[in-house]
Every structure is written in structure tokens, then in C-alpha cells.
Amino acid sequence: MVRKMSEQKDYKNTLNLPETGFPMRGDLAKREPGMLKNWYDNDLYQKIRQSSKGKKSFILHDGPPYANGSIHIGHAVNKILKDIIIKSKTALGFDSPYIPGWDCHGLPIELKVEGLVGKPNQKISAAQFREECRKYAREQVEGQKKDFIRLGVLGDWDNPYLTMNFDTEANIIRAFGKAVANGHLYKGSKPVHWCLDCASSLAEAEVEYEDRTSPSIYVRFAAADESAVENKFVLTEQGKGKLSAVIWTTTPWTLPSNKAISINPELEYQIVQFGDERFILAAELVESVAQAVGVESWKALGSAKGSDLELLQFKHPFYDYNVPFILGDHVTLDGGTGLVHTAPDHGQDDYVVARKYNIGMAGLIGNDGKFNSNAKFFAGLGVFEANGKVLEKLDEVGALLKLEKIRHSYPHCWRHKTPIIFRATPQWFIGMETQGLRQQALSEIKKVRWIPDWGQARIEKMVENRPDWCISRQRTWGVPVALFIHKETEQLHPRTLELIEEVAKLVERKGIQAWWDLDAKDLLGDDAAHYSKVPDTLDVWFDSGSTYYSVVKNRPEFNGKEADMYLEGSDQHRGWFMSSLMLSTATDNKAPYKQVLTHGFTVDGQGRKMSKSIGNIVTPQEVMDKFGGDILRLWVASTDYTGEMTVSDEILKRAADSYRRIRNTARFLLANLNGFDPKRDLVQAHEMISLDRWAVDCAFRAQAEIKEAYDNYQFHTVVQRLMKFCSVEMGSFYLDIIKDRQYTTKADSLARRSCQTALWHIAEALVRWMAPILSFTADEIWGYLPGERGEFVFTEEFYDGLFALDVSESLDDAYWQQVITVRNEVNRVLEQARNDKVIGGGLEAEVTIFANDEYSALLNKLGNELRFVTITSKAEVKTLADADVAEGEVAGLAIKAIRSANHKCPRCWHYSDSKDANSLCSRCEENVNGNGEERRFA
């Protein structure tokens, strides 16, 4: 018999109220540092390595950031993306080590150290200077390392790779030796990017383009023999006056080095009468040149094809020698005159075309960017300083046709932000055509998966157009070009490959200083008198470009396997991706990576680049101090990284809102798992209530999509699916419905344990979905989940305890989706009733659902449990024909809501058949004092 409890007023102790120590507020900025300490005190990374042992490997090779300065938001994006991939690959069942690295040699560090201790060989010896550079780089690495760790990035931070580690320096030299062995190295004088402030050559990736105002001049080159020139043209009229070829340039300082005039063999050229003079111009550019120089009328006197004009001679404007017309395909009709001033010292195209004609260099400019004595009128002047003098000289000799100013894009040094020049210097190169390197690299590009796919076309174009790679630098702090060359012939020592390995062994023991300390006699014996050590250092892009060999092939964690992925910002197509591709192809005939993923740059809320002058810089440190690392990570994951990544306070607040929804879902799950022991209380799938089985099936389907999105690096899709699951499928439907069953049924009833079983499965899955992105929060949740488990979520694979609904299940997903449609329509009507003050809350309502046959059959399956789905005190189904209200927004449904006339149960708050306001409803009487109510569906 059921005993009446109508006199009892407080029923709180009879309810299964949610309870958890998991805090409602994340307080991430305060809590995360403590979690990090726990991770490192307990050697988390090594535990992940141990748990992954023997699994299929996935190697993401870290592109080394430069060891200088604090990390910026772009660094944070890069490291977080890598960390998400490493953690998700671990969860997908891979062994995925992460060895962070740093680029430690090169000019920026030299400049910082110069500011501290002076230039090498002035106040301090070169050896001491290198030691100071090493010390400075080490300090920078430690500072950046702390910031990267604070982001929640897991890796072997105690054993990173540094390009200045002795073993790495030695292996860089060995990679150089392999390139030499394969015949890719040569020495030559070629025009290279030259920074006057650095007094050194620059790599392509160290060049930035900024707008600059330059002189724009048209210059006459008088014909050396007018009749010889005229004879090559088909003339319709002789014309009158002096005959000149006209060139256009924005670099007057290069004119002293002019050695030729390039024309296109396929273009038509004309002799044109401009006033009292005759000019040779490309036929299609005559009109634009006339406008530029202020000539209103002109007359074409004759024409000729470019190929017919080869080797015609013209006088240099101010030196006593002639320059020839030479043929070059680089001459276009994009601007100018169709005749290109050619100075092989100062332009790549100029150098290539002049070489075909055996035209040598002028050699007028020294390392300091000043003209030498051979430049005569301009001796001692800096190149840009000389611009004015050249213009004066041109005007003096009558060669200056027109002078204007032009604003145009011009190459600048990435470090000094000052304009650079092209300058021919003796350097060491890896030849793009040597041994077919260019074609082999292009072939390898096609074997790589590029993410996004436009990356392939981008790097292909760069490889097609790039010049030979100048790998030598005239610096102090860098890996040496470890070669001995003959003092007279400049030929390499016949034992070069053997000597390179000997040097590598020395460097392995003592670092790069061993090269400069080395007495050539120690390796060469009597040969030392005839050979000298090369004083140059390797381009730092060679350092980082060779890490596929110096690190990936030599770290035991990688087991000699090649990298599966390189991941960097989109500027690295011409940087690290390029240098790595060229070197790996030169040494191993294959690309060093299977996949290359690039992310865009960060911009502010208005789409502007981060800039100190604008004052719009968002630093990761500020974000973490204000919001916490997980919010920064969630922003990165939820942003489509294939384009520009917009970050602002407003956007981060939106990320924080999304975070709260996820956290609240997790907290609800944990609070309702109070008292649940999976070993004791777990309900088998076939015994679970229908709605609970559906919820697990929902998680099963979500997990399949989330795993696929992680596997395809679509992290914004992961976040969207996570949000949909938490907010829509769970939050606005399932979790809302189960509250009554969870709180009011008997604590150990099937109805409640079935629900808790579903919640437990969902929580086990959810925490793993979150872990790669919301690492701190996932770790926190992990500590509150019931049941035996490993110490950290990061050693786990995705949860395998979810299940799909059986195909024979009549209440399948399609069924519940239709129920959701009905419930949404009921909610719309209830909301209107609330607005009309008919009811307060939904439990005050009784609803009648007038439904067509399809919906009637659907809803009647739930029987008396329909009211638990609508969360009303009563819900009954009648035929649509009996409706006394109009159909609503869903065809086939008409909903009527009235205020219940019954008493409110003081325990479950449903309005029912209790005799008065203090009496329990019959359902609660059964749950408190009887055997408990039964549920089958909801």
C-alpha cells in the first residue's frame, strides 16, 4: 500500500537534485596555470608518448619560429593549430610526437647582440660574439617557450630542436654536403638582393615590398652608326635629326652599370619622328611614350622586327663605350618603351640575357653600397645618393628626355625596412637548372596534398620563376659554408665531401666555432698552403630548410620516417616550404612532406593588419590574462584559417559566449551523474528508455562527423558540430526533457539509471571531442567524471562506447526529429500563452494537439509520456478535424493551450489530480513511497 504524505511540505530531500564540484564559471585565466603545473609535474607528454607506442605514426614537423622577441598572435594561431592536430591525431589512434623547434642563427640576432656588445672584431672577437649570440638566442627561446606552453600546447619542451644545437649544426653541414655531392652547388657572381644596412645578401623570403617614390626617367642612347641602324629598318621616309634608342627606368643609379639594351625579338619596332629628333620605340608603345614626354604629334618613319635589330650599337650616355641591342623574352609591352636598359650587375633578367651574349659585369659598387673609382663621376657616392648626380650628368650630356616622380612598389629589407638593391657579388648558389632541380621540384609538388588546394598553384608559380638560390651570407653568426677552395684556381678541394664530414664531426663536438678555430693543416696537411677556408655562412633558410634531415631523420621519436605534415602561415610558400622542398629534392630527390597546410594572417575587426602605429595589436598574453587560453584556442578553432583570421575583443567575447554554452552542457552532465557508478549502475543499451537510446545515437552520429572533421583539419566544422550538439540536440531538447525523470523518479530506478547511462556515454564522448581544442576544460571535466579512468584525457582515443540505434528500432532518429517538430510548435503556442498571461510556466498548461493521421500515429506511440516531451502537465492528441483552433506554422497540426484547473504538486510542480495544494500527485506518491513510476519512452 502507498502511504499518504499530504501533510509533508518540504520534499527537497526526496528529489535527486543535481550536484557537482565542477564550477559554473571557468575562471580560466586563474585556473589554467595550475593545470599546466599538474601536466608538467606529472610528465604528461611522456605519458602520451608511452600510451601511443606501437601505433601508426603521424609526424607533424614544427617549422621553427625565429628566436627573437615575444610571441605574437600569429605565433599563437600557428602553435594552437599544430597542437589541435597532434591531440586529435592521438585521439584518432596515431602515435603523433611533437618536437618544437627554433631558428637560432642569422642577422636579427646579430643586430640585437651588436647593440649589446658592439660589432665583431671591433670591441669583441668574432668567437666571443658568436658566444653572445648563442646566449641571447637561448634566452629568447626560454621566453617564447613559456608563452607557447601557456597556450596549452603539449610537446617535448624539455628537448626541443634548436638550429644552434651542436648536433643540428653538424647535420645542417651534412645536408649541405649531400647537395654538393649531388652536383647542385656552384660559385658565381650573380645579382642578388643586397641590403646596404645588413651589408649582406638577402633570401627571397627576407624581402618585403613597400611603396616608395622614385625618379621615372626616359633616356636617349644615341646610335653609334646611324646609317647602320637605318639600314635595318624598312623606311618610308628618312626623317631628320639625331637617332636614339629610348629606355625608361626608375633606378637612375644603375645606368653607370649599363651594358646593353634588351629588345623583344617578336615585337615590331619603329623609328618615329618626335619634333627634331628620331627615336626607336616599340610600335605599340609610341603613343604612350609621346604622352609621357609631352609630344603632341609624331610620325612613323619605318619599322623592323626586333630579331632584325640584334647587335646594333648605341653610345653609353656618359661613358666612352657602345652598348648593343640584345634579344630577350623578358621585354614586354606592359610599360616603358619596349627597350629595356640592361645592367647585368643589378637585375636577374639582365644577368640572364647578358650571359647569353657573354657580356660581363660592370662591378662598380662595393659591399658598402658605394661606387668605386671605376665609376668616375660617381666614385664614393652611395647608390641612392648617386641618383641625383646621374640625373645631372644625363641632363648635362643631353641624354635626359623626361624626368618625373613615380610612386611604386619597391623591395625593402624585412629587418631594416629600408630599400634594397640588386647587386652582383661572388656567392655560392644551388642551381635551379643544375641536375634538373627545378623540374624535379615541380614534379614533387604534384605528389603533395596542399591545404587549401590553391597552395599548389602558388608554390608551383614560385618554383617556376625563382632564380638560383644564393645560399651564402657574409655574416658572423651562422653555420659555415664548410669548403676549402684553391687560392689560385678557386676550385674545390678534391676531397671536399670527405672534408665536409670531418668538419661536421668537429662541429658535432664543439659547435660552429670549431670551423673558425680550425687550422686548415689539421685536415689538409701540406695542401693547406694552397687552399683557404670559405669565410661565408649559410643562409638561415638553409638551416630551417634542412631540418627534414637534421631533425626529422635524426630524432629517434620519428624512427627515420619523413614528415606527414608541414603547417605554417601562407607567407611560407616562398619561405620554409620552398627552402625545404628545394633542399630535400636536391639531396633526396623527393619532397620532405606529404601534406602542407597553410593558415592566413591575423587582422583586426576592421580587416587591418596588426600594427604598432595603428595601435590595434592583440597579444596572446593579453587574451589569456583576460579570457584564458581555452578562449584563445576556441577562437582559433572556430575561425576558417584558410583566409584572414579576424580577431578583436568583440570576437573573443563571442568565443567566450560559445565556451559558456559548452561548459554549461558539461556541468549539467556532471551534476546529473551525481551518485552514478558505471560499474554498478550502467544500463545495457537494449534495456534503456527510447529517448536515452536516441540521445546516445545522436552522440554516435555527431562523433562520426567530428572525427571526420578533425581528420580533414576542418576545426571550425568541429566547433560548429559541437555547438549544435550542446545547444540544439541536447540543450534545447533532450536535456530539457530528462530533468523531470532525473529529479523525480527513484534514485536507482531504471528510468533514472537509463538516463544517467546516456549522460555518462555522452560525457565520455564529449570530453574527448573537446580535448584537442578546449584542452584545459577537458582536463578539468575529466577529473569529475565517474568511473575508473586514466590520469589524463590526452592519452585516450575517441570514445568507443557509443552505439547507433538498431535498424529495427521504430522510434528512430527520423521519428524523434518529427517529435522535435511537434515540440517546437507546442513551444511556440506556449510562448504566446505566456505573453498573453494565460500561463506562467509550461507546467501550468494543458495542451491539446489536434493532428492529422501521420502525426496522431506518431504521438500516440508515446502514450501518457507525451506530456514529458512537451513539458506540460497534460498533453492529449485529437484528430485535426475536431480542432477548435487554426492550424499553426506546421501543416497537419493545431495546438491549443489552456491553464490547468488542477492543483500544483509541491514536489514535481506538475498540475494534477492531487486533492489540494499540499498533497502529492499520484505519480510522486508512487516515486516517494511506492515502487516508482515506469517509463518506456521519455
From Swiss-Prot:
**Enzyme category, top tier:** ligase
On the tree of life, the source organism's domain of life is Bacteria
* Cited function: Catalyzes the attachment of isoleucine to tRNA(Ile). As IleRS can inadvertently accommodate and process structurally similar amino acids such as valine, to avoid such errors it has two additional distinct tRNA(Ile)-dependent editing activities. One activity is designated as 'pretransfer' editing and involves the hydrolysis of activated Val-AMP. The other activity is designated 'posttransfer' editing and involves deacylation of mischarged Val-tRNA(Ile).
Instruction: Read off the InterPro entries from this record.
Output: aa-tRNA-synth_I_CS (IPR001412), aa-tRNA-synth_Ia (IPR002300), Anticodon_Ile_BEm (IPR033708), Ile-tRNA-ligase (IPR002301), Ile-tRNA-ligase_type1 (IPR023585), Ile-tRNA_ligase (IPR050081), M/V/L/I-tRNA-synth_anticd-bd (IPR013155), Rossmann-like_a/b/a_fold (IPR014729)
Quaternary structure note: Monomer.
| Cellular component, GO, one term | cytosol
Supply the source organism for this entry.
Mannheimia succiniciproducens (strain KCTC 0769BP / MBEL55E)
Q: How is the cofactor bound?
A: Binds 1 zinc ion per subunit.
Q: Which CDD domains match?
A: Anticodon_Ia_Ile_BEm, IleRS_core
Citing just one GO molecular function, the answer is: aminoacyl-tRNA deacylase activity
Its recorded name reads Isoleucine--tRNA ligase
Q: Which reaction does it catalyse?
A: tRNA(Ile) + L-isoleucine + ATP = L-isoleucyl-tRNA(Ile) + AMP + diphosphate
| Family per similarity comment | Belongs to the class-I aminoacyl-tRNA synthetase family. IleS type 1 subfamily.
Residues bound to L-isoleucyl-5'-AMP: E568
BP GO annotations:
isoleucyl-tRNA aminoacylation
